[in-house]
Amino acid sequence: MTEHTDRERTKMSDTQIKPVRTSKQAKEEFESIVGQYLESNPIISTNNKTSELEIRFGTNPKVSKPINKMGYDNVVKQLYACGFKPENSRGNQILRIQNEFVDTRTGQIKMSNIRAEIVGTDLIQEYCRTNNIQKVIDMPSTLFNKIKFTQKMSAVDSKGGYIRKLDMEDFNFRVSYQTEQDFNVQSGLSRNIISKWTDSKKLFRSMNRVRFYHDEYPIFADISIVKGSKRMNRIPVPQYTIQEAEVFSGQESYEIELEIDNAKVGTGTAYDNAARLMTDLRKCIRIILSGLQESKYPIPYSEQEHVLQSYMRMVRGEGYQTKRIYPKDFIGPGSFTLQIENVIAHIEDSTIVSIRDNYCVTEKADGDRKLLYIANNGKIYLIDTNMNVTFTGSKTNEKTIFNSLLDGEHIREDKHNKYLNMFAGFDLYYVNGKSVREFPFINYLPPIETDENIEKGEIVAKKFRLELLSELIELLKPISILETSSNDEVEPKENKRSPDLIVKCKGFNASSEHGNIFNACSKKLSDINDGLFEYTTDGLIFTPMDLPAGGNTLNGSPGPLYKSTWEKSFKWKPAEFNTIDFLVSVKKDKTGRDEVHHIFQEGRNMEGNQEVIQYKTLVLRCGFDERKHGYLNPCQDILNDKLPSPEDLDNEDSYKPVPFQPTNPYDETAHLCNIILKGDETNLYMMTEENEYFEDDMIVEFKYVMDNDDGWKWVPLRVRYDKTSELRAGMKNYGNAYHVANNNWHSIHQPITEYM
């Protein structure tokens, strides 16, 4: 057997994937592939050659976003929740290497379809040290199953034709039936590759793989964190050594696969026909998709895109041209942190906003900010701040509220960590396709007469958003569109109230009803302290009663139709809950390496009996735009003749990450933070309080502890994987914007207490 002839005969490129025209055709092709796999009697292995049927998720980045850390974690949670167990919760460390070879027939250099696989941290470390696979083979700890060579080939059907891979684009996974043949390191083919090892360029893939199994399903779930060879124009570049390939300095990617357990299927087992195996395959596919979409009711990605484009048409009007959707298209305005100057009485001719004038207050739930969108067919969806769509599994039959948009908090668990799945609405933007953003929030004036000619069933006749929101939720009456039948298949079910999704209207205490805003706050805080809310709360939200949504003037226009911060809306948290999201980078020495310091050098012992404590110093950065936030060094700009011009107003490149330099109180070292390194003798890492590893160019949420020594006041709480994935996808997400970070800094140092 020769490497190049087998490759020419059997390797299938991604361009030869089975073309699919309809969903029905795709399902039939899927079942056909499963049937052909079972006909091969996969329980039997011949000459170390086995059949392999796998399903890989997130294969087409044009259909859905690549799988990120949040998707990875959500799938793990879903697997555990559905009874899957890991073979090894720490996972296996695997290094896979493919070599280039010269095709003797054409003289061209090609990439082999045979890969070397090294398993185990000790063996991988030895390879990284030597770049010599023979030295790894010669190690005493090398066992026969720790290193091998594997050739994957496309399977053939009964007529000798290749069985092509199948892309199920609706849910963005690929079905692949292949044969896999292993060769030990002493085989002729392996020895031939080893003999040319140092003279051939290679592609590297380093991964941590955790395999999950289920007692009732003949299916493995493999989840992997992968780092590979450096890419150029998205194509991996072969190199001679793993160091030249820059494998470990690259960005992590995440892979999720299902693979059939050959030992449990085929002749003589309960899974001897395609229909039986397909039933369990569909269940496991649904489990993975539920994790990726954070929903019990995964939907096609085409449906998600349709929902987003329908949302945009409603918001932007009929003139809207279909475009790519970005997080900035979330129209719910954010809130500023409440400061002491916002609590004092309004000063004449001052531009400072006071919550004493026409404000109401509600509790801030510990949930995720989302929009609830009622589509033109009554289906109810949630849209998060990153414009990810989740189907709730519910719909409404009330046609007068189709094409409506609510703003609120999605609360997954109650305060006892039990499943809740509640949407607590706090604002309303569109009803039946018509904007109500222009209306005031609460009726703060004496009753006014309404037009008698307004159609009775049209709730837009009322002119206050909270009143409309309350009535819309009364009309909503969500019902489930699904019900599990006796054969465990999902069937449509009409007119059944949903036991899953709860939609409620949050309660607001108005200053006009309680005498003043302080009495309104006192009542709300009493309700919180008395445990009247079934969910966890972490503060208060103050909303102007008399202004349009996001607007700043009475009877004026509402706010912009993109992500923004509403200067008239405020949030209050107890000081200990005020945090800032920073983009972190480690201080470097003159050689470009991370600076590592030792506690004993400064005569300080942090952990008692530990002799030497090592730490790194971080530079904390936030997003800064000179057009909005001022100038970092205006005097130097003038000296350098770097003056602003009108063209700068439309310069999208002006938003950039800069070290955090707060103004009130000013602290020139506020952007520096020391982090203790944790780990074992050989590996030391920066960790958050939630025991999450983090590194350069990640966005991390920090709290500020006043009592800590200088340099140690910032404490990392958790990694913001959502924001980090946006940054690494090329978006301008650098943590909190400067004005938000500066506002929170001021609130941390001059906190407003519950009793003020």
Please give the residue ranges for each predicted region.
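Compositionally biased low-complexity segments enriched in polar/charged residues
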Residues: 2-11
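Phosphate-end processing signature that detects enzymes handling 5′-triphosphorylated RNA
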Residues: 11-320
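Eukaryotic intrinsically disordered and solvent-exposed regulatory patches
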Residues: 39-42, 195-198, 208, 219, ...
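Nucleic-acid 5′ end/cap handling module spanning
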Residues: 46-48, 53-58, 134, 140, ...
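Beta-strand-rich binding-surface signature
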Residues: 52, 204-211, 218-220, 253-257, ...
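Short helix/loop capping segments that flank catalytic or ligand/cofactor-binding pockets
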Residues: 221-223, 231-233, 266-269, 370-373, ...
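Conserved loop->alpha-helix
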Residues: 376-415
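Internal, well-ordered alpha/beta segment that forms a basic, Gly-enriched binding/recognition surface
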Residues: 412-441
